[in-house]
C-alpha cells in the first residue's frame, strides 16, 4: 500500500476542519497539545483499501476529508456495504486490534490517525475523549437503528431521498451552516455504490434520482453535484420529520 504521509505541521488541531465534531471536540488546549504528540496523517487515493477485514489495526483515526465505505464479504464472495465514513467519523475500536469490515476510500481520503496504545492511555487520563467517543458511538447506534427502518420499510424513492438528506445535513453541519436554506454538496457515491448501499438495482437508483430531479426536489450539475433548494420537501420525500431522521 502506497501512503502519502502528510506533515503534521500543516494540520494544527486548532485549525482542523472537523475540530468541532470529531472525537477531540471537547478537548481543551492542553489536551489538544497531548493529542498533537501522538497523531499523524495518512492519505489514500480513491479506490484504495485502508484496511482489510480481519487485519490487525494498530491505529484509530478520524476522517478529515473525503469518504470511505465499510464493506463485509460473505463466504460465497457476495459483498455488502454496511456503512459510510464521512468527515469527523471515527474508525477503529480502542481495546480491539482487529476490524470486522473492509475500509475503502471512495474518494481521495485524509485521515488523522492516533497510535492505538497511546490513544487508549489518553482515554484513561482524559475523560473528555472517552465521553465524546461514547456519544459518537451512541449516535452511530441510533443511526444503525434508523437504517434498519430505511432498508426494511421505505420505498425506493424514500431510500434515495433519505440518503441525500443524510449527506446534505452532514455537509451543512461540517460547514457550520443551517439546514433550512438552499444546500449544495457533492454526492460521494456512484450510482452503483448507492444501489449496493441501499439494496436497490442500478436501474432503480438512476430512475429514482431522475424522478426527484424531474419533480424539482433536487437539481443536478453533472453526475455528482446536488442542489437542494427546499430541504423540508426532501425530508417529506424521505418520510422523515424535521430533524432529518439520522443523527449527524
From Swiss-Prot:
Note: Possesses 4 cysteines which may bind a metal ion (possibly iron).
Xref: SUPFAM superfamilies: cAMP-binding domain-like (SSF51206), Winged helix' DNA-binding domain (SSF46785)
The protein's role, per its UniProt record: Anaerobic regulatory protein; transcriptional activator of hemA. Appears to regulate other genes.
The species this protein was found in: Cereibacter sphaeroides (strain ATCC 17023 / DSM 158 / JCM 6121 / CCUG 31486 / LMG 2827 / NBRC 12203 / NCIMB 8253 / ATH 2.4.1.)
Name under which the protein is recorded: Transcriptional activator protein FnrL
NCBIfam families per the UniProt record, alphabetical: TransRegFnrLRhodb
DNA-binding region: 191-210
Signal sequence residues: none
This protein's encoding gene: fnrL
Keyword Membrane: no
Record key words, sorted: Activator, DNA-binding, Iron, Transcription, Transcription regulation
